[in-house]
Amino acid sequence: MSNQVRVAVIGTGSLGKEHARIYADLAKAGLAQFTGVFDANPEAARTHAARWGVRAFASVAEAAEASDALSVVTPTVTHHAIARELLILGRHVLVEKPMTDNSEQAQDLVRLAKENGLVLQVGHVERFNPVFSYLEQAAPFPKFIECHRLSPFPARSTDIGVVLDLMIHDLDVVMAFVKSPVVSVDAVGIPVLSRSEDIANARLRFANGCVANLTASRISPERMRKIRVFSGGDHPVYISLDYRVQEGFLYRLARDGEEESSLLRKLLAAKESTIVSEFAGKRIVREPVPINKDEPLKLELSDFVACVRERQTPKVSGAQAKAALDVAFEIVRQIQSSP
């Protein structure tokens, strides 16, 4: 393989076209070679190929022949067959979430990638959100986590329920963040507009004692992607973060004498920091968090290309994605088996 990775996109729907856009940008920057796109609808493939000046492939095999690494951005039910074909052909794969629609298929992809020494990355894009990067270093001892992921009913992903469509993002984030086995799951959900669950709530307990409460809805009148974390240790903090706008606040105890410091007085005067509670001589300070905003999907695809080039393990490996998927399947099982 040359130093410039040849990349292609399988599927040019609402998300696939974004993969194509970013690969085109990487190609302009000399970081990859964008070879082309394939879609089950040949006209769609030709339209997107013409837009980016690349090839419209006639088949997955033809796309693989011209490429080193490919994004699979197709309906979930097709993920396993397409990714499997590519891995057998010796190609590196980024498959969008959810990885597959059952655990056995996910394990099959993990096995094939390992046996062939290939990169298998799964598109859990929130792991590349600068919000998550900040959270990892700011809250090292999570004790309680609350996630809300709400959206109006989509025109896509109607082949799966809200757990595999939306909640899977938060399952992956929380499990990667807590770094401890899930020991219990308690879930509830209901279908409203579709045959699958459209609203779901799950409570996870981890071996280290951390508890996470996750809520997902795809029938909300507004969009929300937020995470709130209570972290313990010698310096307990509460952090509230918004994935969409990449902003948030940190709440912490003021250190002795800090309220008299010139820096805090300046922040308080500018209303960038606020004293929100006082008791027994202690004060809780709220302050905005420093986040370097960026496009998560761009960071994700750049990382995929770099992992292929350097033969490194991706941040979201197939094995990690399967672990989150298995918890998602347990949540769905509980929802479907409840009266």
Stretch-by-stretch model annotation:
Residues 1-52, 174:
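N-terminal Rossmann-like dinucleotide-binding module
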Residues 19, 52-110:
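Beta-loop-alpha module in the N-terminal Rossmann-like domain of NAD(P)-dependent dehydrogenases
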Residues 35, 68, 143:
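Conserved acidic residues
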Residues 100-157:
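A contiguous active-site-proximal alpha/beta segment in oxidoreductase catalytic domains
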Residues 154-222, 226-230, 243, 319:
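Rossmann-like dinucleotide-binding domain that binds NAD(P)(H)
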